[in-house]
Regions:
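C-terminal motif of bacterial Sec signal peptides marking the signal peptidase cleavage site
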Residues: 17-21
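Mature, Sec-exported extracytoplasmic domains of Gram-positive
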Residues: 27-204
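Bacterial signal peptide processing site
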Residues: 23-25
């Protein structure tokens, strides 16, 4: 329960700082530049945002900024690996009312590195999903995330983050990057794996 409450608090803070952080001004040192059109990329917190997170003494969330044209809806999906294939285990959908949309996604994690919650903000508002902590724990774990700007292609999922957990201390983990994990789930040998994607879709 403590993790859930902490995740909710952190996501609320992320939503607050996201409302004004996706704009470009002449003062480059105190603002976050938006990505190029039809691009999603890792975001960098400005100093004021970092200071707010330090007050909470919690792990910094993983942030992605995006800018897209021609999409009518986007959705974030959470997948869990089962029998060599990705199976949906959660997510959220948001309609797009503007021809050009800018927004930010924030992912938060528990002490063991596992996914705890997600918030996403666009020009229409903010929404969030929180996940109860799992009862099972892993002796070792690893995670990877998208590190470079990625071109947004409508109707094609973009993998943002992948997690791998092992139940045995001696087990070796091959931590594939999210894009490889999305396309090749059959190669993953970990005891547990989770993936988060975002998809932007056109009308019709």
């Amino acid at each position: 329960m403590k993790l859930r409450k902490l995740s909710a608090l952190l996501l609320t803070l992320c939503c607050a700082v996201m409302l004004g952080s996706c704009k470009v001004t002449e003062t480059a040192t105190t603002t976050t530049a938006v990505p190029s059109k039809n691009t999603i990329q890792p975001a960098v917190l400005i100093q004021e945002e970092s200071n707010l997170l330090e007050l909470l003494d919690v792990q910094q969330p993983m942030l992605f900024d995006f800018s897209v044209e021609g999409a009518s809806i986007y959705w974030v999906e959470i997948f869990t690996l089962q029998d060599g294939a990705w199976q949906p285990s959660g997510g959220s959908t948001s309609p797009i009312d503007e021809p050009d949309l800018r927004g930010r996604i924030a992912l938060t994690f528990g002490e063991d590195g596992r996914f705890a919650g997600i918030a996403f903000q666009d020009e229409d508002g903010v929404s969030r999903i929180s996940q109860d902590p799992e009862t099972s724990a892993f002796v070792s774990h690893a995670s990877t995330s998208a590190a470079d700007p990625i071109e947004i292609v409508l109707d094609e999922p973009i993998a943002l983050w992948a997690y791998y957990g092992e139940q045995e201390a001696a087990a070796s983990t091959t931590a594939y990057f999210p894009d490889h994990a999305l396309q090749n789930p059959q190669e993953i040998q970990s005891d547990f794996a989770q993936l988060i994607t975002i998809t932007f879709a056109a009308a019709g």
